A protein has these predicted regions:
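AAA+/P-loop NTPase substrate/partner-engagement loops
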Residues: 89-118, 124, 144
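Conserved alpha-helical scaffold flanking the Walker A/P-loop in AAA+ ATPase domains
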Residues: 113-137, 168-175
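Extended, charged alpha-helical coiled-coil/arm scaffolds that mediate oligomerization and mechanical coupling
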Residues: 1-61
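The Walker A (P-loop) glycine that initiates the GxxxxGKT/S ATP-binding motif of P-loop NTPases
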Residues: 73, 110, 139
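Active-site phosphate-binding and catalytic loops of NTP-dependent enzymes
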Residues: 20-24, 58-65, 93, 119-121, ...
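Conserved catalytic/switch belt of AAA+ P-loop NTPases
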Residues: 137-182
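Short loop/turn elements that form and flank the Walker-type P-loop nucleotide-binding site
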Residues: 64-67, 90, 115, 128-133, ...
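Walker A/P-loop
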Residues: 62-99, 126-127, 156
Length: 186
């Protein structure tokens, strides 16, 4: 057996496990969605209205790209649990990626050298098993820039609707469509 066999097998397993065409079906009943959000969170009226507005437009046309929602507030007000409630209300899988203290962009987009792995975006997609989850990118304000790169610039590429249909993880080295993901930032 070749010494590279394990590396090749690992790459193929990652490639085969990316949920290229597997997606969950969104709940589109606005009354049910609103009830689920109200049952789990008191207040947050504007945030709930924005989610309902997105679902209403999405139910008319599937051409609408997923919005990027930014939840702002002091610690402990329920931003993370509200993001989880959105995913449950929409019947989508939920992924949380903590960005606090991240200083290496390769953590998000993987690395290409031998023995490396995909970044958190791809591994999270594989873990959740669908191509349209709700992604919570937590503590975006705590990203750090250093000699390893600027994860904020990488994050901009991931979130930009004109680019995220053709996202390329450095390890996978194939285009992955992230446009169906509902990104929520805190």
């Amino acid at each position: 057996m070749s010494p590279d066999a394990g590396i090749i097998r690992n790459y193929i397993e990652y490639l085969l496990n990316v949920p290229w065409y597997t997606e969950t079906r969104d709940e589109r009943d606005l009354i049910k969605i609103e009830k689920k959000l109200n049952d789990t969170h008191y207040g947050m009226k504007k945030a709930k209205e924005r989610v309902i507005e997105y679902i209403a437009v999405k139910s008319i046309t599937d051409e609408v790209s997923s919005p990027i929602i930014c939840l702002v507030g002091p610690p402990g007000v329920g931003k993370t649990t509200f993001a989880e409630s959105i995913s449950k209300a929409l019947d989508r899988n939920f992924v949380k990626i903590s960005l606090g203290g991240m200083s290496d962009s390769a953590e998000l987009v993987g690395q290409a050298y031998i023995g490396s792995n995909p970044g958190k975006i791809v591994t999270s997609l594989i873990k959740c098993g669908s191509n349209n989850p709700v992604f919570l990118l937590d503590e975006v304000d705590k990203l750090k820039k250093d000699y390893k790169g600027d994860p904020a610039s990488t994050l901009l590429d991931i979130l930009d609707v004109s680019q995220n249909k053709r996202f390329v993880d450095n390890y996978i080295d194939e285009e992955i469509d992230l446009s169906k993901i509902l990104f929520i930032l805190t």
